[in-house]
Amino acid sequence: MSDGDTIKVLADGNKVVKIRLHGIDAPEKKQAFGRVAKNTLSSKIAGKIINIVPTGKDRYKRELAKIYLDNEDINRYLVRNGYAWAFVKYSKDYIFDENYARAHKLGLWQDISPTPPWDFRKAKKKHKIK
């Protein structure tokens, strides 16, 4: 696992493929809940056979996909349990699940005002430029 929304899988022909989970954005590793999100994803799927449903490529040409373990949408699981945001800029698939996690104060929603990863990245980028 690279982080809570990116995985590396061994595909046919023993080729390692990096996949960005479609429709979600997990906290960055150095953010609050970043390591928890990564560890949750890892404990859920590491070493298991998953079903990958490609959805396209992102602006960085990374493969995007929904991943399933025994018919469970893992992307949805991460959002619904408060380990990731619904990435509504690119997909509306998981809005209901984010609202559920917020209402029940699950995972990162235990924090009064969690910082979305896109704001964290933007602030980090600004800081590097100066």
Language-model features, listed with the residues they occupy:
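Small beta-barrel nucleic-acid-binding modules, primarily SNase/OB-fold domains
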Residues: 1-130
